[in-house]
Curated annotation (Swiss-Prot):
SUPFAM superfamilies: Putative DNA-binding domain. It comes from the Bacteria. Keywords: Cell cycle, Cell division, Chromosome partition, Coiled coil, Cytoplasm, DNA-binding, Sporulation. It comes from Bacillus licheniformis (strain ATCC 14580 / DSM 13 / JCM 2505 / CCUG 7422 / NBRC 12200 / NCIMB 9375 / NCTC 10341 / NRRL NRS-1264 / Gibson 46). Required for the formation of axial filaments and for anchoring the origin regions at the cell poles in sporulating cells, thus ensuring proper chromosome segregation in the prespore. Binds in a dispersed manner throughout the chromosome but preferentially to sites clustered in the origin portion of the chromosome, causing condensation of the chromosome and its remodeling into an elongated, anchored structure. GO terms for biological process: asymmetric cell division; chromosome condensation; chromosome segregation; regulation of DNA-templated transcription; sporulation resulting in formation of a cellular spore. This is Chromosome-anchoring protein RacA. Residues 160-175 have a biased composition (Basic and acidic residues). Residues 3-23 bind DNA. One of its GO terms (cellular component) is cytoplasm. Residues 158-186 are annotated as: Disordered. InterPro entries: Chrosome_anchoring_RacA, DNA-bd_dom_put_sf, MerR-type_HTH_dom.
Length: 186
């Protein structure tokens, strides 16, 4: 039975059950998800703990009677006397199978997360490249505008320079010859 069921049977909160297990270092099994799983023996121990606390015994003075489990060793196998070897083997096989299934699900979930992170990373890299390209385009466009502006300035300066030359040439042509030059024409 899980922690919630044990707490209901004892008439305490789930946190209280968890605290007792941790502080008194009670041997409680855990399922494949890491949650406590209590047997009838565990519930009996927890009931004793509750009774001692109810009678005013401080937590550090609570004594726990742990049932002694005996084992026979036969051909390098350990067999618990309370449970036949076949049932124990079946339970172990079942737990192992559930554990392997859980591990497979965890592995698949991790692979999906990795694939999603890789996809996001590629997308972010594409966005960065796109941004850089847009920035370079803007810079190129600004440079083109500057070049165009400079070309216009150069054209204006060249046309002004031509006009000034033309004006200077016309002035030279229109200037009356000085009297001295007219007297001495060679």
């Amino acid at each position: 039975m899980n922690t919630a069921d044990a707490a209901n049977e004892l008439g305490v909160s789930t946190k209280t059950v968890q605290r007792w297990v941790k502080q008194l270092q009670l041997p409680a099994s855990r399922n494949e998800l890491g949650h406590y799983f209590f047997t009838e023996d565990d519930i009996a121990i927890l009931k004793e703990v509750k009774e001692q606390l109810k009678n005013g015994t401080p937590m550090q003075d609570v004594t726990v009677k742990r049932p002694k489990k005996t084992f026979f060793i036969k051909k390098n196998e350990m067999i618990q006397t309370k449970e036949p070897a076949l049932q124990l083997n079946e339970r172990l096989e079942e737990r192992l199978q559930r554990f392997l299934e859980h591990e497979q699900l965890e592995r698949e979930l991790l692979q999906k997360k990795i694939a999603e992170l890789e996809r996001k990373l590629e997308q972010k890299a594409d966005e960065v490249v796109s941004y850089q390209l847009l920035q370079q385009r803007r810079e190129l466009e600004e440079e083109r505008q500057q070049i165009k502006h400079l070309e216009q300035k150069i054209s204006q300066l060249e046309s002004m320079n031509r006009r000034e030359k033309d004006t200077a040439v016309r002035r030279e042509e229109k200037k009356p010859k000085s009297k001295l030059k007219s007297i001495f024409s060679f």
